[in-house]
A protein has these predicted regions:
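Amphipathic alpha-helical coiled-coil/heptad-repeat segments
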Residues: 132-174
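Short, basic/aromatic beta-hairpin or loop at an interaction surface
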Residues: 26-39, 81
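A generic structural signal for short beta-strands and their flanking turns/coil linkers
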Residues: 18, 36, 84-86
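Active-site/binding-pocket entry motifs
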Residues: 27-28, 65-66, 112
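Low-complexity, Lys/Gly-biased intrinsically disordered segments
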Residues: 1-30, 44-48
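A short glycine-rich beta-alpha junction/loop motif
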Residues: 14, 79-88, 100, 117-139
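A short beta-sheet element
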Residues: 23, 43-107, 124
Length: 174
């Protein structure tokens, strides 16, 4: 994200405004979370040079809680988002990448070997660039992504079934 003179100060963050200004609580190990939100004005948004999300960008946390990944797709209702200085935007330049595949690889990467800092862990971009990601042909990436989607749906269905079973068990005990 932009770390320049126009970086938002605490008195320039609002509970409602034009552009959602992401913090580390918004990017979790499971993707985006909007339980807590802070916004900047349109004027402040225009002053910042870097860190504006575009649809289908991937956000990676690089300071504090390192390695959390979120995907900015059409399911995210906010149209204007910016990352803070402890995050990176990954915007693939090549069309032969399946975003779901890349997100899975990023979420399951062990960043510990390239993290520096003991008080506040960080993943400098220079070290991040040295990480090699597996890149099979697009057909295999797509097959893997479809499989992960199927597993996610099955896991969700199982979680619902367990909740229903627990609720019915509670009522049968009463």
């Amino acid at each position: 994200g932009d770390r320049g003179k126009n970086y938002p100060k605490s008195d320039e963050l609002f509970s409602e405004e034009y552009c959602l200004f992401l913090n580390t609580k918004n990017v979790t190990k499971n993707g985006f979370s909007f339980d807590t939100k802070q916004f900047i004005t349109k004027t402040k948004d225009k002053l910042l040079r870097k860190g504006k999300l575009e649809r289908y960008d991937i956000v990676l946390t690089t300071r504090g809680t390192v390695g959390n990944v979120a995907y900015y797709d059409e399911l995210i209702k906010y149209k204007h988002l910016r990352i803070n200085s402890g995050m990176l935007i990954l915007r693939p330049k090549t069309p032969n990448l399946n975003q779901k595949f890349i997100i899975h690889v990023l979420r399951n990467n062990n960043y510990s070997r390239v993290i520096s800092g003991s008080a506040q862990p960080q993943l400098p971009i220079t070290k991040l660039k040295k990480i090699l990601l597996p890149l099979p042909p697009l057909a295999l990436q797509n097959e893997f992504a479809d499989f992960v989607t199927l597993v996610d749906k099955s896991q969700f269905a199982c979680e619902i079934a367990i909740k229903v079973w627990r609720n019915s068990l509670k009522f049968s005990i009463i």
